[in-house]
Every structure is written in C-alpha cells, then in structure tokens.
Swiss-Prot record:
GO terms for cellular component: plasma membrane. Keywords: Antibiotic resistance, Antiport, Cell inner membrane, Cell membrane, Hydrogen ion transport, Ion transport, Membrane, Plasmid, Transmembrane, Transmembrane helix, Transport. Its main location: membrane. Belongs to the major facilitator superfamily. TCR/Tet family. It is a multi-pass membrane protein. This is Tetracycline resistance protein, class H. It holds the Pfam family MFS_1. SUPFAM superfamilies: MFS general substrate transporter (SSF103473). GO terms for molecular function: antiporter activity.
Length: 400
C-alpha cells in the first residue's frame, strides 16, 4: 500500500474521530456560556451548523480539488481544522464556539477529496474495495471518537479539542512530507480551461448518460440507513425492554460488522460479480433485515438482523465504485462531493422525518418504519432491474 493511500485513510479516520470526539464534552463546554434552559437549543444548533457546512462545502472542496489538485485542498483543510480546534479549546465566548463549529464543518468536509484521491490512485476494478476501506476506517473512527472524547473529557472539557488540534497538526506535517499529488496533470490542465469553469458545466455534468438513477439510488440507500441510526435506541427499549448496556453492546456489534462488510466483503463481491450485482445483493439483504425487525418480536432475531443491516452497508462502496468508473478523471471531485452532500442531507432530514413517524406510529405498531424501509428497497430493486435492461452496462460521462 503506497504512502498516499495511507495518508488518505488516516485523514478519513481522523475526520470520523473528530465527529464523535467532542460530542461528550460539548454540553459541558456550553455550560460555561449559556444557561441550563437554553443548553439543548444551542447544542442542537451547533450540531446542525456542522452538518449544514458539510452539505454546502463538500461539493465545493471536491470541485476545487479537481481544479487545483487533491494535496493543496487536503493541506488547507488539515491546517484549518488544527487552528479551529485550538480556537474551540480556548474559547472565551459563545460566538467563538459557533465560529469554531462552522469552520469545523468546512474543513471537515474532506470526504469528497479523500474519495477522489482514492479513485485517482486505484485501478477501476479495485475501487469498490478501496472505497470499502474508506468506509471501514470511517466506522472505526466513529467508534473511537466518543470513547476517546469521554476519556479526555474526564480530564478537562477542553482536552479533546487540544488533542484534535495536535493530531491534525501531526497529520498535516505527514501529508506535507509523504502525500503525493494523485490527480493526473492532464486532468488538472483540463479543469483550468475557461470552458470547464462555467457555471453551466458544473450543473450539467451529471445530466449525461442516465447517472441520475444511480445518484437517486445512493440517496435512498443512505436515507434508509438513517432508520436504525434514528430509532434503534428507542425501538430496542420499547420492544425488548433493553437497558443502556444492552443497547450499547448491540451498537458496538453493528459497528464491527459494518466495518467487516464494507472493508473486506464488498470489494471481494464487486471483483467477482461486479458493482451492480453487489448493489442488488446488499439491498436485498438489508431489506431482509428490515423485515425481520418489522415482524419478529423475539430477541434472538437481533443478531441475524444486525448481520443483514451491516451487510446492507456494502451498497455504498459498490455504488461509489460504479459511479467513479462512470465519470472522467477531471470530474471525480464533483462526483464525490455530490455523494458526500447527499449523505449529509439524509443525515439532516432522516432523523427529523423518522423520529416524527416513529413517535406517532409506535403506539399502533413499532415496526412500521422497518416495513417502510423494506418497501423502499423492494421498489428500488424492481426499478433497478428494469433500468438495467434498458441501459448499456457502462455510461461514461465527461466534462465538456
């Protein structure tokens, strides 16, 4: 594995750690500036600000990396993140925290750049495998982040921010020394020509060759993935009367299984049967998991359901791999930025929508949301089957 890939994976895991690192201590830090009555409001606004900045700036950073190269954008993001965490560590007013979260959302929107860099350095046949690695290490970071934040938060509410600033600074130096620009020179030159810098070109790049269907599929898969993320705690407490320990253990098992399927299994399936077949398999398995959780009330169903939900995560790297092979090198940043934005949008609307539906449906049937997820998958599978019959195996697009 070359040094650039290692740096890409390190940046990805550090971004994921950063998401969860401050969660345990942010309320404590807010207590220094706001009253108890307004704490929850400010906490929610800060989280929403971060997510909103990710939605806005992921495609922007992706496009900038197409134009100027992956390395400058990654170095800028790491430097900005290090300075931002220092700002938050030594904040003396509430507005400094708000500015810090805005900057964190901007500089943390590097998922598109990392995915673009990964597509630059990996052969097309192996992209699903390496996108699976990205998803796997991101999952590791999401597990480590809250644990580390809790441990460091016991020392001081400011300590997680100091740790994040130091770790980003170290990775900045490593990237400066060992990360080589991954984008081909001809792609950089092409993206700097006047005709490639028009607003219409940016907007129309994905209108070609029917990639809309697969972008919509990606969005719906990510949206369905917000169902367990939103209601798992409430659902298991209501149906199985679980305590926090049991819930925490089940989430840990789901996290480990998710990493396994994304980092190891997805790539092997894609190499053997292709990305589209892997996508169909993952949707079918995830649909089975949703049906199990919708109808079966025995606790023994949890393990097979968790396996199904985790295996359903293979659809994301497989779709990334397929879409990445379907665009030219000089459009990778735009593509990956679009995918990251779609993911972040589902992370905003999914919890709001599904929490609302669950709160009103639980009194009648607590399995309604799982059934809705299964129905969405069934509709996707049927639509995908007919879509594949009408389209050619590969739709190559280019930036005019």
């Amino acid at each position: 594995m070359n040094k650039s890939i290692i740096i890409i994976l390190l940046i990805t895991v550090l971004d994921a750690i950063g998401i969860g690192l401050i969660m345990p201590v942010l309320p404590t830090l807010l207590n220094e500036f706001v009253s108890e009555n307004s704490l929850a409001t400010h906490y929610g606004v800060l989280l929403a600000l971060y997510a909103t900045m990710q939605v806005i700036f992921a495609p922007i950073l992706g496009r900038l990396s197409d134009k100027y190269g992956r390395k400058p954008i990654l170095l800028f993001s790491l430097l900005g993140a290090a300075l931002d965490y220092l700002l938050m560590a030594f904040s003396t007013t509430l507005w400094m925290l708000y500015i810090g979260r805005i900057i964190a959302g901007i500089t943390g929107a590097t998922g598109a750049v990392c995915a673009s860099a990964m597509s630059d350095v990996t052969p097309a046949k192996n992209r699903t495998r390496y996108f699976g690695f990205l998803g796997g290490v991101f999952g590791v970071g999401l597990i480590i982040g809250p644990m580390l934040g809790g441990l460091l938060g016991d020392i001081s509410a400011h300590m997680p921010f100091i740790f994040a600033a130091i770790s980003h600074s170290i990775l900045l130096i490593l990237s400066l020394l060992f990360f080589r620009e991954t984008q081909k020179r001809e792609a950089l030159v092409a993206n700097r020509t006047p005709e490639n810098q028009t607003a219409s070109n940016t907007v129309t790049v994905f209108f070609k060759k029917s990639l809309y269907f697969w972008l919509a599929t990606y969005f719906i898969i990510q949206l369905i993935g917000q169902i367990p993320a939103t209601i798992w705690v409430l659902f298991t407490q209501y149906r199985f009367d679980w305590n926090t320990t049991s819930i925490g253990m089940s989430l840990a098992v789901l996290g480990v299984l998710h990493i396994f399927f994304q980092a190891i299994v997805a790539g092997k399936l894609a190499q053997k049967w292709g990305e589209k077949t892997t996508i169909m398999i993952s949707m079918s398995i995830d649909m089975m998991g949703c049906l199990l959780l919708a109808w079966i009330g025995h606790v023994w169903v949890i393990l097979p359901a968790l396996i199904c939900l985790a295996a359903g995560g293979m659809g994301q790297p497989a779709l990334q791999g397929y879409l990445s092979k379907s665009v030219d090198d000089n459009a990778q940043g735009k593509l990956q930025g679009t995918l990251v934005s779609l993911t972040n949008i589902t992370g905003i609307i999914g919890p709001l929508l599904f929490a609302f539906i669950y709160s009103y449906s639980v009194a009648y049937w607590d399995g309604l949301l799982w059934l809705m997820g299964a129905i969405l998958y069934a509709m996707l599978l049927i639509t995908a089957y007919f879509h594949q019959r009408k389209t050619t195996p590969k739709a190559v697009i280019s930036t005019p």
